[in-house]
Amino acid sequence: MATFHFDLVSPEQVAFSGEVDQVDIPGAEGDFGVLAGHAPVVAVIRPGILTVTAGGAQQKIVVLGGIAEVSEKGLTVLADVATAVADLDMQDFAATIATMEQQLPGKVGDVLDRSIERLDHYKSIQHQISTTAMH
C-alpha cells in the first residue's frame, strides 16, 4: 500500500509526524478516510477519534476539533486538542463529563446550547473508546 506523510499538531505538541497508510478523520460533515493520492481538501474536524494506520498497526487519538488539510504534500491536521487514547485517563475523562453535567443547570441560552453540544461530544468519545477504540 502506498504511504503519505501525516502531521498531527496541537497547540501543546506535535502529536504525530510520519509516513502512514491511512488516516480516518471525524469530519464535521461526516467521517472520512485519507489514503495516498487523496484529492486536495480542507475540512473542519469535529470532536472524536482519529485513527492512524501505519505498517499494519493502528493508533487512535482523541481530537477535540480542528482543521484537516490534504495536499500534494500529504495530510496536516491542526487539532485544538490531541491525546492518544492509550494516554487518556478514563477516570479523569469520566470526572470531566460528570462536572460538565453538574454545571448544566446554571447555564441558559447559547451558553447552554454550546455546553450541551460539548457534553454530547465528550459522551460520544467516551462511548467510542469503551466499545471500539481498543480493538
From Swiss-Prot:
Keyword match Transport: yes
GO cellular component: plasma membrane; proton-transporting ATP synthase complex
Membrane-topology annotation of the record: Peripheral membrane protein
Cellular location(s): Cell inner membrane
Gene (UniProt): atpC
Source organism: Rhodopseudomonas palustris (strain BisB5)
Highest taxon above the source species: Bacteria
Family affiliation: Belongs to the ATPase epsilon chain family.
Function: Produces ATP from ADP in the presence of a proton gradient across the membrane.
Subcellular location, principal: membrane
Pfam families listed in its UniProt record: ATP-synt_DE_N
Keywords, ordered alphabetically: ATP synthesis, Cell inner membrane, Cell membrane, CF(1), Hydrogen ion transport, Ion transport, Membrane, Transport
InterPro entries in the cross-refs: ATP_synth_F1_dsu/esu, ATP_synth_F1_dsu/esu_N, ATPsynth_dsu/esu_N
NCBIfam families: ATP_synt_epsi (TIGR01216), PRK13448.1 (NF009982)
Disulfide pattern: none
Protein name as it appears in the record: ATP synthase epsilon chain
Assembly with partners or alone: F-type ATPases have 2 components, CF(1) - the catalytic core - and CF(0) - the membrane proton channel. CF(1) has five subunits: alpha(3), beta(3), gamma(1), delta(1), epsilon(1). CF(0) has three main subunits: a, b and c.
